[in-house]
Design a protein with these regions (language model features):
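Extended, non-catalytic subsegments within catalytic or DNA/protein-binding/adaptor domains
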Residues: 1-182
Length: 182
């Protein structure tokens, strides 16, 4: 992971690098491992949230990005889809802000991405990763077109990300925390 930051493969150096960074964080913290899972992300199910929490130092504001993953239908014995029993079965995944290193903060990258996307798409429930504009420069107000990133490009980006060891370490750590909570 450190190598990707140092080689400027992660960051905000270009529209493609920003997309790569978002996909990296979505893989690392949301545990998305396939192109299909990434294609389920949308501007309406990935949202910025802030809430107040009590800490040893008192009240503090915690900012995060939350992803409300689609519920997986379980098949009943008769082969039909069972209904969701409880609302809390819908997985809610989170990426918290990185106050220790704001230059690697998932929330800041998400906010920057939104600012570079066409406003008309920010309420869409069928797209998240957009194709970069062909002729944009860093100072351009928009970096992305209204065209969704195609599957083959997503798969290519994802294959590079899945080669990073820390992706699996973070996902294992988060899974272990969830198991401890049960």
């Amino acid at each position: 992971e450190e190598h990707l930051w140092e080689c400027k493969q992660l960051g905000v150096y270009s529209p493609f690098v920003l997309l790569n960074t978002l996909m990296f964080f979505n893989t690392k913290f949301f545990g998305l491992q396939t192109a299909d899972e990434h294609m389920q992300l949308s501007f309406t199910n990935v949202v910025r949230q802030s809430r107040k929490c009590t800490t040893a130092r008192g009240m503090t504001k915690v900012v995060s990005i939350r992803y409300c993953a689609p519920a997986k239908q379980k098949k009943g014995r008769d082969g039909t889809s069972g209904k969701r029993k409880r609302e809390d079965e819908v997985p809610m995944l989170e990426q918290r802000e990185n106050r220790m290193n704001p230059l690697r903060c998932p929330v800041k990258f998400y906010e920057f991405y939104l600012s570079k996307c066409p406003e008309s798409l920010r309420n869409r429930n069928d797209v998240f990763y957009l194709q970069p504009e062909r002729s944009c420069i860093a100072e351009s107000p928009l970096w992305y077109s209204v065209i969704p990133m195609d599957r083959s490009m997503l798969e290519s980006m994802l294959n590079r990300i899945l080669a990073v060891r820390e992706i699996y370490e973070e996902h294992s750590r988060l899974s272990g925390l969830e198991d401890d909570m049960d």
